[in-house]
Amino acid sequence: MSAKPTKINLLNFNRAGLREYFSSIGEKPFRADQMMKWIYQAGVSDFDQMTNLNKALREKLKAQCEVKAPEIAYQQGASDGTIKFALRLEGGQEVETVWIPDEDRATLCVSSQVGCALECTFCSTAQQGFNRNLSVSEIIGQVWRVATTIGLSNDSAKRPITNVVMMGMGEPLLNLKNVVPAMDLMLDDLAFGLSKRRVTLSTSGVVPALDMLGDQIDVALAISLHAPDDKLRDEIVPINKKYPIQEFLAGVRRYLAKSNANQGKVTVEYVMLNGINDSTDQAHELAKVLADTPCKINLIPFNPYPGSPYSRSSNSRIDRFAKVLSSYGLMVVVRKTRGDDIDAACGQLVGDVVDRTKRMLKKQMKGDEISVKMEH
């Protein structure tokens, strides 16, 4: 018995790709625009409901195509309103996505890979190793699935998602070919229509890919720094051995020079590890290292996970660290932890690739006092 033909998942196309596909099947490109409105603005995945497409086209699409996002395996709500979604992929793997509501926004923390290859020692995701990259449909499908589950609205003030942070499982710059089209859809007015300042990509420092990113799309940038010197960063963020701090920061400055989304500043993420990177001397060193890179700094209280060798810095140590940075005129925010009672806080996202006791999620990243980030 012959295998069932694989259907084309329309979530894998950004607007340019969808127009090209419609042209290839003999349809006018404007049909792609209509399709995008149905999928992303109306949340419709059933071609029969797309009533402004003629019946012949609907039948053709049903035979050849599908609109398929990852399914919800389970979801958990936290006491602060945060919801963690475990989404099941083709092949049975799972990734976790976190929705963080706040008074004036709702942020979604999105994964780019199953697992992560970067081996950051303080991150639970890194302990599971790397499995595979997510496809465009699996990345934008996280946004679509959560948005349609929470409830789409034509009222911009009631949007289920106002901000997206690429801070979930994985290193986004190691999956650039799928992350960029997915972010295109986040920004596209026919899809989710988010401002480029409300879509943030976080990287641990894949410098060549960062240069490529700047040539392909303009979104807000956050960097996972976590150490003020190469010796320590080599230990806790091993990609630093390939792209040391000064090389990384030079790449950041090149990106900022091309970008309007960042308003001239990068967000520097720094997880506070007790007795490791949180001394006042290290704060002085960090301020000096960042002197030539316009930035705002998010200090992230470490979120422990089972088997972690680290502990969280005390509030008093974090406050002292922040005051030293502020004395240099740097903008400093101590990130507010969200969703930690459901393992949905920064550094706790793992998914289903490994033992569930290692599960990890990430936190919130915002331009003010709240942030979501899943450490790489």
From Swiss-Prot:
Enzyme class label = transferase
Q: Name one GO biological process term.
A: rRNA base methylation
The protein's UniProt keywords, in alphabetical order, are: 4Fe-4S, Cytoplasm, Disulfide bond, Iron, Iron-sulfur, Metal-binding, Methyltransferase, rRNA processing, S-adenosyl-L-methionine, Transferase, tRNA processing
Q: Which reaction does it catalyse?
A: adenosine(2503) in 23S rRNA + 2 reduced [2Fe-2S]-[ferredoxin] + 2 S-adenosyl-L-methionine = 2-methyladenosine(2503) in 23S rRNA + 5'-deoxyadenosine + L-methionine + 2 oxidized [2Fe-2S]-[ferredoxin] + S-adenosyl-L-homocysteine; adenosine(37) in tRNA + 2 reduced [2Fe-2S]-[ferredoxin] + 2 S-adenosyl-L-methionine = 2-methyladenosine(37) in tRNA + 5'-deoxyadenosine + L-methionine + 2 oxidized [2Fe-2S]-[ferredoxin] + S-adenosyl-L-homocysteine
**Which residues make up the binding site for S-adenosyl-L-methionine?**
G170, E171, S202, S224, L225, H226, N303
Compartments, as annotated in UniProt: Cytoplasm
Q: Where does [4Fe-4S] cluster bind?
A: C116, C120, C123
NCBIfam families with a match to the protein in the record: PRK11194.1 (NF008396), rRNA_mod_RlmN (TIGR00048)
What's the further remark here? Reaction proceeds by a ping-pong mechanism involving intermediate methylation of a conserved cysteine residue.
The entry's family comment says: Belongs to the radical SAM superfamily. RlmN family.
Name of the protein in its database record: Dual-specificity RNA methyltransferase RlmN
Q: Which organism is it from?
A: Pseudoalteromonas atlantica (strain T6c / ATCC BAA-1087)
